[in-house]
Protein backbone atom coordinates (compact mmCIF):
# COMPACT_ATOMS: atom_id res chain seq x y z
CA UNK A 1 0.00 0.00 0.00
CA UNK A 2 1.27 3.44 -0.98
CA UNK A 3 0.06 5.47 2.01
CA UNK A 4 0.49 8.77 0.19
CA UNK A 5 -2.08 7.69 -2.42
CA UNK A 6 -4.83 6.83 0.06
CA UNK A 7 -7.96 8.84 -0.66
CA UNK A 8 -9.32 10.09 2.67
CA UNK A 9 -12.80 9.06 3.75
CA UNK A 10 -15.08 11.98 2.86
CA UNK A 11 -18.48 10.57 3.82
CA UNK A 12 -20.27 9.79 7.04
CA UNK A 13 -20.45 6.07 7.76
CA UNK A 14 -23.79 5.27 9.44
CA UNK A 15 -23.40 3.72 12.87
CA UNK A 16 -24.43 0.11 13.42
CA UNK A 17 -24.13 0.19 17.19
CA UNK A 18 -25.85 -3.06 18.07
CA UNK A 19 -24.33 -5.34 15.45
CA UNK A 20 -21.27 -6.44 17.46
CA UNK A 21 -21.81 -8.43 20.66
CA UNK A 22 -18.17 -7.80 21.58
CA UNK A 23 -19.03 -4.15 22.18
CA UNK A 24 -22.78 -3.80 22.56
CA UNK A 25 -24.29 -5.08 25.81
CA UNK A 26 -21.21 -6.72 27.28
CA UNK A 27 -20.38 -3.83 29.63
CA UNK A 28 -21.51 -0.18 29.83
CA UNK A 29 -18.95 2.58 29.45
CA UNK A 30 -19.10 6.37 29.26
CA UNK A 31 -18.52 6.71 25.54
CA UNK A 32 -18.07 4.07 22.87
CA UNK A 33 -17.49 4.68 19.18
CA UNK A 34 -19.56 2.54 16.76
CA UNK A 35 -17.34 -0.43 15.99
CA UNK A 36 -18.30 -0.56 12.30
CA UNK A 37 -17.13 3.04 11.85
CA UNK A 38 -13.86 2.45 13.69
CA UNK A 39 -13.30 -0.78 11.78
CA UNK A 40 -13.83 0.98 8.44
CA UNK A 41 -11.30 3.67 9.33
CA UNK A 42 -8.69 1.20 10.57
CA UNK A 43 -9.13 -0.93 7.45
CA UNK A 44 -8.92 2.09 5.14
CA UNK A 45 -5.86 3.76 6.63
CA UNK A 46 -3.72 0.76 7.63
CA UNK A 47 -2.61 -2.72 6.53
CA UNK A 48 -2.39 -6.11 8.21
CA UNK A 49 0.66 -6.12 10.46
CA UNK A 50 0.60 -2.34 10.98
CA UNK A 51 0.79 -0.78 14.44
CA UNK A 52 -2.49 0.96 15.35
CA UNK A 53 -2.66 3.15 18.44
CA UNK A 54 -5.46 4.68 20.49
CA UNK A 55 -3.90 6.91 23.19
CA UNK A 56 -7.33 7.53 24.81
CA UNK A 57 -8.46 3.92 24.49
CA UNK A 58 -11.61 3.83 26.64
CA UNK A 59 -13.42 0.49 26.41
CA UNK A 60 -11.11 -0.68 23.63
CA UNK A 61 -13.14 -0.43 20.43
CA UNK A 62 -10.16 0.77 18.37
CA UNK A 63 -7.73 -1.79 19.77
CA UNK A 64 -10.12 -4.73 19.52
CA UNK A 65 -11.15 -3.94 15.94
CA UNK A 66 -7.53 -3.35 14.92
CA UNK A 67 -6.49 -6.69 16.45
CA UNK A 68 -9.30 -8.54 14.68
CA UNK A 69 -8.13 -6.97 11.40
CA UNK A 70 -4.66 -8.40 11.93
CA UNK A 71 -3.03 -5.18 13.11
CA UNK A 72 -0.79 -4.86 16.14
CA UNK A 73 -2.97 -2.84 18.47
CA UNK A 74 -1.80 -0.54 21.25
CA UNK A 75 -4.48 0.49 23.73
CA UNK A 76 -3.63 3.22 26.23
CA UNK A 77 -5.80 4.64 29.00
CA UNK A 78 -5.14 6.06 32.46
CA UNK A 79 -8.25 4.28 33.71
CA UNK A 80 -7.61 0.70 34.96
CA UNK A 81 -11.35 0.03 34.59
CA UNK A 82 -11.14 0.76 30.85
CA UNK A 83 -8.06 -1.43 30.47
CA UNK A 84 -9.76 -4.26 32.37
CA UNK A 85 -12.75 -4.23 30.02
CA UNK A 86 -10.53 -4.14 26.93
CA UNK A 87 -8.24 -6.94 28.09
CA UNK A 88 -11.11 -9.23 29.06
CA UNK A 89 -13.07 -8.78 25.84
CA UNK A 90 -10.06 -8.98 23.51
CA UNK A 91 -8.43 -12.07 25.03
CA UNK A 92 -8.23 -14.96 22.55
CA UNK A 93 -6.57 -17.54 24.80
CA UNK A 94 -9.65 -19.69 25.42
CA UNK A 95 -10.17 -22.61 23.07
CA UNK A 96 -13.93 -22.18 23.46
CA UNK A 97 -16.43 -20.91 26.02
CA UNK A 98 -17.04 -24.39 27.45
CA UNK A 99 -14.60 -23.83 30.33
CA UNK A 100 -16.12 -20.44 31.03
CA UNK A 101 -19.61 -21.94 31.30
CA UNK A 102 -18.28 -24.60 33.67
CA UNK A 103 -16.65 -21.91 35.80
CA UNK A 104 -19.97 -20.06 35.96
CA UNK A 105 -21.72 -23.23 37.15
CA UNK A 106 -19.08 -23.57 39.86
CA UNK A 107 -19.82 -20.01 41.00
CA UNK A 108 -23.48 -20.95 41.24
CA UNK A 109 -22.66 -23.97 43.38
CA UNK A 110 -20.65 -21.75 45.74
CA UNK A 111 -23.08 -18.90 46.21
CA UNK A 112 -26.45 -19.24 44.40
CA UNK A 113 -28.42 -20.33 47.47
CA UNK A 114 -26.77 -17.65 49.61
CA UNK A 115 -27.61 -14.93 47.08
CA UNK A 116 -31.23 -16.07 46.84
CA UNK A 117 -31.41 -16.04 50.65
CA UNK A 118 -30.12 -12.45 50.66
CA UNK A 119 -32.94 -11.45 48.32
CA UNK A 120 -35.44 -12.61 50.99
CA UNK A 121 -33.45 -11.58 54.07
CA UNK A 122 -34.53 -9.23 56.84
CA UNK A 123 -32.41 -6.23 57.82
CA UNK A 124 -30.96 -8.17 60.76
CA UNK A 125 -30.05 -11.11 58.52
CA UNK A 126 -28.45 -8.76 55.97
CA UNK A 127 -26.28 -7.22 58.67
CA UNK A 128 -25.12 -10.70 59.59
CA UNK A 129 -24.16 -11.43 55.96
CA UNK A 130 -22.31 -8.11 55.59
CA UNK A 131 -20.30 -8.86 58.72
CA UNK A 132 -19.09 -12.13 57.20
CA UNK A 133 -18.17 -11.22 53.62
CA UNK A 134 -15.14 -9.48 52.20
CA UNK A 135 -15.93 -5.86 51.31
CA UNK A 136 -13.80 -2.98 50.02
CA UNK A 137 -13.01 -0.07 52.32
CA UNK A 138 -15.89 2.37 52.74
CA UNK A 139 -14.08 5.32 51.15
CA UNK A 140 -15.38 8.85 50.65
CA UNK A 141 -16.79 9.62 47.19
CA UNK A 142 -16.23 12.74 45.03
CA UNK A 143 -17.87 15.96 46.23
CA UNK A 144 -20.33 15.99 43.32
CA UNK A 145 -21.87 12.68 44.42
CA UNK A 146 -25.27 12.35 46.08
CA UNK A 147 -23.70 9.67 48.28
CA UNK A 148 -20.98 10.54 50.77
CA UNK A 149 -19.37 7.11 51.14
CA UNK A 150 -18.88 4.07 48.91
CA UNK A 151 -21.38 1.82 50.72
CA UNK A 152 -24.03 4.54 50.34
CA UNK A 153 -24.18 3.68 46.63
CA UNK A 154 -25.87 0.36 47.47
CA UNK A 155 -28.77 -0.95 49.46
CA UNK A 156 -27.63 -3.50 52.09
CA UNK A 157 -29.21 -6.22 49.93
CA UNK A 158 -27.28 -5.16 46.81
CA UNK A 159 -24.03 -4.83 48.73
CA UNK A 160 -24.38 -8.27 50.31
CA UNK A 161 -25.43 -10.02 47.09
CA UNK A 162 -22.63 -8.51 45.02
CA UNK A 163 -20.09 -9.34 47.73
CA UNK A 164 -21.19 -12.98 47.86
CA UNK A 165 -20.81 -13.37 44.09
CA UNK A 166 -17.44 -11.63 43.99
CA UNK A 167 -16.12 -13.70 46.89
CA UNK A 168 -17.14 -16.84 44.96
CA UNK A 169 -15.42 -15.58 41.80
CA UNK A 170 -12.22 -14.69 43.63
CA UNK A 171 -11.45 -18.36 44.38
CA UNK A 172 -11.57 -19.35 40.68
CA UNK A 173 -8.00 -20.62 40.03
CA UNK A 174 -7.78 -19.69 36.33
CA UNK A 175 -6.77 -16.05 35.87
CA UNK A 176 -8.41 -15.78 32.43
CA UNK A 177 -11.68 -17.34 33.57
CA UNK A 178 -11.72 -15.27 36.75
CA UNK A 179 -11.27 -12.07 34.73
CA UNK A 180 -14.21 -12.90 32.46
CA UNK A 181 -16.42 -13.77 35.43
CA UNK A 182 -15.42 -10.47 37.03
CA UNK A 183 -16.35 -8.73 33.78
CA UNK A 184 -19.88 -10.13 34.09
CA UNK A 185 -19.96 -9.22 37.79
CA UNK A 186 -18.68 -5.71 37.03
CA UNK A 187 -21.42 -5.23 34.42
CA UNK A 188 -23.93 -6.34 37.07
CA UNK A 189 -22.66 -3.66 39.46
CA UNK A 190 -23.85 -1.04 36.93
CA UNK A 191 -27.43 -2.22 37.51
CA UNK A 192 -27.27 -3.30 41.15
CA UNK A 193 -26.73 0.05 42.83
CA UNK A 194 -28.74 3.10 43.84
CA UNK A 195 -27.71 5.17 40.81
CA UNK A 196 -29.73 2.86 38.55
CA UNK A 197 -32.55 4.82 36.92
CA UNK A 198 -35.35 2.58 35.65
CA UNK A 199 -36.94 3.67 32.36
CA UNK A 200 -40.53 4.79 32.86
CA UNK A 201 -43.16 2.70 31.10
CA UNK A 202 -40.78 -0.21 30.55
CA UNK A 203 -39.60 -3.23 32.52
CA UNK A 204 -37.74 -2.28 35.71
CA UNK A 205 -34.52 -3.75 34.36
CA UNK A 206 -34.64 -1.47 31.29
CA UNK A 207 -32.68 1.55 32.33
CA UNK A 208 -29.17 2.52 33.27
CA UNK A 209 -26.95 4.13 35.83
CA UNK A 210 -26.82 7.92 36.17
CA UNK A 211 -23.05 7.47 36.03
CA UNK A 212 -23.32 6.86 32.28
CA UNK A 213 -26.06 9.39 31.48
CA UNK A 214 -25.84 12.33 33.89
CA UNK A 215 -22.13 11.68 34.52
CA UNK A 216 -22.24 11.86 38.30
CA UNK A 217 -23.29 9.67 41.21
CA UNK A 218 -26.94 10.75 41.26
CA UNK A 219 -29.07 8.48 43.44
CA UNK A 220 -32.47 7.48 42.11
CA UNK A 221 -35.47 8.98 43.88
CA UNK A 222 -37.14 5.56 43.65
CA UNK A 223 -34.59 2.87 44.39
CA UNK A 224 -34.93 -0.23 42.21
CA UNK A 225 -33.64 -3.54 43.58
CA UNK A 226 -33.32 -5.87 40.61
CA UNK A 227 -32.98 -9.63 41.25
CA UNK A 228 -29.30 -10.09 42.02
CA UNK A 229 -28.49 -13.55 40.64
CA UNK A 230 -30.64 -13.13 37.54
CA UNK A 231 -28.93 -9.82 36.77
CA UNK A 232 -25.51 -11.45 37.07
CA UNK A 233 -26.69 -14.39 34.94
CA UNK A 234 -27.90 -11.98 32.24
CA UNK A 235 -24.61 -10.08 32.20
CA UNK A 236 -22.75 -13.40 31.99
CA UNK A 237 -24.82 -14.36 28.93
CA UNK A 238 -23.65 -11.13 27.27
CA UNK A 239 -20.02 -11.95 28.08
CA UNK A 240 -20.50 -15.41 26.53
CA UNK A 241 -21.95 -13.81 23.38
CA UNK A 242 -19.03 -11.39 23.16
CA UNK A 243 -16.43 -14.08 23.71
CA UNK A 244 -18.05 -16.46 21.22
CA UNK A 245 -17.95 -13.70 18.61
CA UNK A 246 -14.26 -12.98 19.25
CA UNK A 247 -13.36 -16.67 19.09
CA UNK A 248 -15.37 -17.23 15.88
CA UNK A 249 -13.47 -14.41 14.15
CA UNK A 250 -10.19 -15.81 15.47
CA UNK A 251 -10.96 -19.33 14.29
CA UNK A 252 -12.13 -18.19 10.86
CA UNK A 253 -8.96 -16.16 10.32
CA UNK A 254 -6.64 -18.85 11.64
CA UNK A 255 -8.24 -21.72 9.71
CA UNK A 256 -8.91 -20.00 6.38
CA UNK A 257 -5.72 -17.96 6.21
CA UNK A 258 -7.70 -14.74 5.81
CA UNK A 259 -5.75 -11.61 4.75
CA UNK A 260 -5.44 -10.44 8.36
CA UNK A 261 -3.53 -13.61 9.23
CA UNK A 262 -3.56 -15.42 12.56
CA UNK A 263 -5.23 -13.56 15.42
CA UNK A 264 -3.61 -13.82 18.83
CA UNK A 265 -4.27 -11.21 21.49
CA UNK A 266 -1.07 -12.01 23.38
CA UNK A 267 1.02 -11.13 20.32
CA UNK A 268 -1.15 -8.43 18.80
CA UNK A 269 -2.50 -6.42 21.73
CA UNK A 270 -0.52 -4.18 24.07
CA UNK A 271 -2.25 -2.50 27.02
CA UNK A 272 -0.68 0.65 28.46
CA UNK A 273 -1.72 2.96 31.28
CA UNK A 274 0.32 6.07 30.51
CA UNK A 275 -0.19 9.78 30.19
CA UNK A 276 -1.22 10.19 26.54
CA UNK A 277 1.11 13.17 26.36
CA UNK A 278 4.09 11.03 27.36
CA UNK A 279 3.91 7.92 25.18
CA UNK A 280 7.14 8.65 23.33
CA UNK A 281 9.25 7.14 26.11
CA UNK A 282 7.25 3.92 25.88
CA UNK A 283 6.86 3.58 22.11
CA UNK A 284 9.56 5.67 20.46
CA UNK A 285 9.34 8.26 17.72
CA UNK A 286 7.87 7.28 14.33
CA UNK A 287 6.76 3.85 15.57
CA UNK A 288 3.04 3.86 14.72
CA UNK A 289 1.23 3.39 11.39
CA UNK A 290 -2.24 4.72 12.23
CA UNK A 291 -3.94 6.44 15.16
CA UNK A 292 -7.68 6.59 15.76
CA UNK A 293 -8.61 8.32 19.00
CA UNK A 294 -11.42 10.06 20.83
CA UNK A 295 -9.97 12.41 23.47
CA UNK A 296 -12.11 13.71 26.36
CA UNK A 297 -14.36 16.63 25.46
CA UNK A 298 -13.38 19.19 28.11
CA UNK A 299 -15.43 18.91 31.29
CA UNK A 300 -18.14 16.58 29.98
CA UNK A 301 -17.05 13.44 31.84
CA UNK A 302 -14.75 12.98 34.85
CA UNK A 303 -13.77 9.43 33.88
CA UNK A 304 -11.58 8.53 36.85
CA UNK A 305 -13.99 9.95 39.43
CA UNK A 306 -16.90 8.06 37.88
CA UNK A 307 -14.94 4.81 37.68
CA UNK A 308 -14.33 4.64 41.44
CA UNK A 309 -17.38 2.36 41.71
CA UNK A 310 -15.48 -0.32 39.77
CA UNK A 311 -11.80 0.48 40.31
CA UNK A 312 -12.17 0.50 44.09
CA UNK A 313 -14.06 -2.77 44.43
CA UNK A 314 -11.91 -4.54 41.83
CA UNK A 315 -8.79 -3.41 43.67
CA UNK A 316 -7.31 -1.35 40.83
CA UNK A 317 -5.04 1.53 41.79
CA UNK A 318 -5.13 4.67 39.66
CA UNK A 319 -1.74 6.12 38.74
CA UNK A 320 -1.11 9.52 37.18
CA UNK A 321 -4.59 10.82 38.02
CA UNK A 322 -3.17 14.34 37.78
CA UNK A 323 -2.53 13.69 34.07
CA UNK A 324 -6.22 13.23 33.20
CA UNK A 325 -7.21 15.47 30.28
CA UNK A 326 -10.45 16.99 31.58
CA UNK A 327 -11.80 20.22 33.03
CA UNK A 328 -13.03 20.06 36.63
CA UNK A 329 -13.47 16.73 38.39
CA UNK A 330 -12.46 16.06 41.99
CA UNK A 331 -9.01 17.55 41.32
CA UNK A 332 -10.67 20.67 39.88
CA UNK A 333 -8.55 20.83 36.75
CA UNK A 334 -8.48 24.20 35.02
CA UNK A 335 -9.26 24.82 31.37
CA UNK A 336 -5.59 25.69 30.87
CA UNK A 337 -4.66 22.25 32.23
CA UNK A 338 -7.05 20.58 29.80
CA UNK A 339 -5.84 22.55 26.79
CA UNK A 340 -2.21 21.85 27.64
CA UNK A 341 -2.89 18.12 27.98
CA UNK A 342 -4.91 18.04 24.77
CA UNK A 343 -2.24 19.98 22.86
CA UNK A 344 0.64 17.83 24.13
CA UNK A 345 -1.25 14.59 23.45
CA UNK A 346 -2.11 15.53 19.87
CA UNK A 347 1.42 16.72 19.16
CA UNK A 348 2.72 13.45 20.56
CA UNK A 349 0.40 11.55 18.21
CA UNK A 350 1.96 13.22 15.18
CA UNK A 351 5.47 12.53 16.48
CA UNK A 352 4.61 8.87 17.08
CA UNK A 353 3.40 8.44 13.48
CA UNK A 354 5.74 7.21 10.81
CA UNK A 355 5.96 9.51 7.76
CA UNK A 356 3.18 9.10 5.19
CA UNK A 357 0.77 7.82 7.83
CA UNK A 358 -2.64 8.95 9.04
CA UNK A 359 -4.29 10.18 12.23
CA UNK A 360 -8.02 10.45 12.97
CA UNK A 361 -9.30 12.47 15.93
CA UNK A 362 -12.96 12.33 16.99
CA UNK A 363 -14.11 15.49 18.75
CA UNK A 364 -17.04 17.78 19.45
CA UNK A 365 -17.56 20.88 21.59
CA UNK A 366 -19.17 24.31 21.28
CA UNK A 367 -15.92 25.88 22.51
CA UNK A 368 -14.02 26.34 19.24
CA UNK A 369 -10.82 27.10 21.13
CA UNK A 370 -10.58 23.35 21.81
CA UNK A 371 -10.73 22.66 18.08
CA UNK A 372 -8.05 25.29 17.58
CA UNK A 373 -5.80 23.44 20.02
CA UNK A 374 -6.16 20.20 18.00
CA UNK A 375 -5.83 21.77 14.55
CA UNK A 376 -2.89 23.97 15.52
CA UNK A 377 -1.08 21.14 17.31
CA UNK A 378 -1.13 18.94 14.20
CA UNK A 379 -0.18 21.81 11.88
CA UNK A 380 2.73 22.82 14.10
CA UNK A 381 4.08 19.26 13.89
CA UNK A 382 3.87 19.31 10.09
CA UNK A 383 0.62 17.38 9.69
CA UNK A 384 -2.04 18.26 7.11
CA UNK A 385 -5.82 18.23 7.59
CA UNK A 386 -7.29 16.05 4.81
CA UNK A 387 -10.89 15.39 5.89
CA UNK A 388 -13.42 16.73 8.36
CA UNK A 389 -16.55 14.59 8.49
CA UNK A 390 -19.60 15.12 10.68
CA UNK A 391 -20.73 11.81 12.14
CA UNK A 392 -24.41 11.81 13.00
CA UNK A 393 -24.91 9.91 16.23
CA UNK A 394 -28.30 8.36 15.55
CA UNK A 395 -28.89 7.17 19.09
CA UNK A 396 -31.26 7.81 21.97
CA UNK A 397 -30.45 11.32 23.11
CA UNK A 398 -29.70 12.33 26.69
CA UNK A 399 -32.27 14.25 28.73
CA UNK A 400 -30.08 17.36 28.40
CA UNK A 401 -30.07 17.04 24.61
CA UNK A 402 -33.84 16.50 24.49
CA UNK A 403 -34.50 19.61 26.58
CA UNK A 404 -32.00 21.79 24.71
CA UNK A 405 -32.14 20.17 21.27
CA UNK A 406 -31.15 23.10 19.06
CA UNK A 407 -28.36 24.22 21.41
CA UNK A 408 -26.62 20.88 22.05
CA UNK A 409 -24.28 19.20 19.57
CA UNK A 410 -25.42 15.61 19.09
CA UNK A 411 -22.93 14.45 16.47
CA UNK A 412 -19.16 14.49 16.28
CA UNK A 413 -16.45 15.60 13.91
CA UNK A 414 -13.94 13.09 12.58
CA UNK A 415 -10.79 15.01 11.72
CA UNK A 416 -8.33 13.03 9.61
CA UNK A 417 -4.76 14.25 9.17
CA UNK A 418 -1.84 13.09 7.03
CA UNK A 419 1.82 13.21 8.06
CA UNK A 420 3.88 13.80 4.89
CA UNK A 421 7.43 12.60 4.42
CA UNK A 422 8.64 16.19 4.51
CA UNK A 423 7.26 18.40 7.24
CA UNK A 424 4.42 20.49 5.79
CA UNK A 425 4.48 24.25 6.19
CA UNK A 426 1.50 25.83 7.90
CA UNK A 427 -0.39 27.29 4.93
CA UNK A 428 -3.60 29.08 5.78
CA UNK A 429 -5.37 32.01 4.22
CA UNK A 430 -4.06 35.30 5.53
CA UNK A 431 -6.87 37.49 4.27
CA UNK A 432 -9.03 39.52 6.64
CA UNK A 433 -10.70 37.23 9.22
CA UNK A 434 -14.31 36.37 8.46
CA UNK A 435 -17.12 37.28 10.85
CA UNK A 436 -19.80 34.83 11.97
CA UNK A 437 -22.29 36.40 9.55
CA UNK A 438 -19.83 36.16 6.66
CA UNK A 439 -19.12 32.51 7.45
CA UNK A 440 -22.83 31.74 7.63
CA UNK A 441 -23.48 33.48 4.31
CA UNK A 442 -20.74 31.39 2.71
CA UNK A 443 -21.63 27.95 4.09
CA UNK A 444 -25.41 27.98 4.49
CA UNK A 445 -26.12 27.86 0.71
CA UNK A 446 -24.23 24.57 0.53
CA UNK A 447 -26.51 22.86 3.05
CA UNK A 448 -29.78 21.17 2.03
CA UNK A 449 -32.91 23.28 2.51
CA UNK A 450 -34.71 20.04 3.40
CA UNK A 451 -32.80 20.05 6.67
CA UNK A 452 -29.46 19.79 8.44
CA UNK A 453 -28.35 19.22 12.01
CA UNK A 454 -26.75 21.92 14.12
CA UNK A 455 -23.46 20.04 14.31
CA UNK A 456 -23.21 19.75 10.50
CA UNK A 457 -23.24 23.52 10.14
CA UNK A 458 -21.08 24.12 13.20
CA UNK A 459 -18.39 21.75 11.97
CA UNK A 460 -18.26 23.36 8.52
CA UNK A 461 -18.00 26.80 10.13
CA UNK A 462 -15.26 25.59 12.47
CA UNK A 463 -13.00 24.26 9.71
CA UNK A 464 -13.70 27.21 7.42
CA UNK A 465 -12.97 29.70 10.19
CA UNK A 466 -9.75 27.91 11.16
CA UNK A 467 -8.52 27.95 7.57
CA UNK A 468 -9.20 31.71 7.48
CA UNK A 469 -7.65 32.29 10.91
CA UNK A 470 -11.09 33.41 12.12
CA UNK A 471 -11.92 30.87 14.82
CA UNK A 472 -12.07 33.60 17.44
CA UNK A 473 -15.14 34.95 15.63
CA UNK A 474 -16.92 31.65 16.25
CA UNK A 475 -16.47 32.00 20.01
CA UNK A 476 -20.21 32.49 20.40
CA UNK A 477 -22.87 30.58 22.29
CA UNK A 478 -25.43 28.29 20.71
CA UNK A 479 -28.24 30.81 21.16
CA UNK A 480 -26.48 33.35 18.98
CA UNK A 481 -26.04 30.82 16.18
CA UNK A 482 -29.72 29.88 16.46
CA UNK A 483 -30.75 33.55 16.30
CA UNK A 484 -28.59 34.08 13.22
CA UNK A 485 -30.22 31.10 11.50
CA UNK A 486 -33.72 32.34 12.28
CA UNK A 487 -32.87 35.76 10.88
CA UNK A 488 -32.03 33.98 7.64
CA UNK A 489 -35.36 32.16 7.51
CA UNK A 490 -34.46 28.82 9.09
CA UNK A 491 -36.64 27.08 11.67
CA UNK A 492 -35.75 24.25 14.07
CA UNK A 493 -37.80 21.05 13.75
CA UNK A 494 -37.88 19.69 17.30
CA UNK A 495 -39.27 16.33 16.15
CA UNK A 496 -36.55 15.62 13.57
CA UNK A 497 -33.82 17.62 15.36
CA UNK A 498 -32.92 19.49 12.18
CA UNK A 499 -33.00 23.03 10.82
CA UNK A 500 -35.34 23.52 7.86
CA UNK A 501 -35.60 26.44 5.46
CA UNK A 502 -38.88 28.31 5.86
CA UNK A 503 -39.82 29.12 2.29
CA UNK A 504 -43.07 30.93 3.06
CA UNK A 505 -43.29 34.52 1.83
CA UNK A 506 -44.16 35.92 5.25
CA UNK A 507 -41.25 34.17 6.90
CA UNK A 508 -38.85 35.48 4.27
CA UNK A 509 -40.10 39.04 4.75
CA UNK A 510 -39.76 38.71 8.53
CA UNK A 511 -36.23 37.35 8.22
CA UNK A 512 -35.21 40.29 6.01
CA UNK A 513 -36.81 42.78 8.38
CA UNK A 514 -34.95 41.29 11.35
CA UNK A 515 -31.66 41.72 9.55
Predicted feature descriptions by range:
Residues 48, 316, 348, 353-359:
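Short glycine-dipeptide loop
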Residues 56-60:
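Class I SAM-dependent methyltransferase "Motif I" SAM/SAH-binding loop
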Residues 321-322, 357-364:
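Conserved beta-strand signature within the Rossmann-like core of class I S-adenosyl-L-methionine
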Residues 354-358, 377, 381, 403-423, ...:
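Core SAM-dependent methyltransferase catalytic element
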Amino acid sequence: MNRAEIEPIQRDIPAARQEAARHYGVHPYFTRRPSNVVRAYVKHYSCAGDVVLDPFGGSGVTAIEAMLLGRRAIHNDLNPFANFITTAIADTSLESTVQLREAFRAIGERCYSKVKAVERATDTELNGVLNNVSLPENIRLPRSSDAEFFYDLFTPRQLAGLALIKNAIDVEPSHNLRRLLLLAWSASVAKLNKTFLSAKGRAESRGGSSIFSIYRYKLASDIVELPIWETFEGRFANVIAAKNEILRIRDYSNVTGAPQGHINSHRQLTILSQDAADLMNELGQASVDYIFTDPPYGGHIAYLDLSILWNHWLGFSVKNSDAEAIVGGELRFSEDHYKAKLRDSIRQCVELLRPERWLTVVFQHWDVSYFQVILDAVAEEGGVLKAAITHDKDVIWSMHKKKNAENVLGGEMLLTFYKPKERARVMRESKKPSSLDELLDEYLPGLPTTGFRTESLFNKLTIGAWERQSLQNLAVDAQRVAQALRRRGWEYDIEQHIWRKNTSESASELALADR
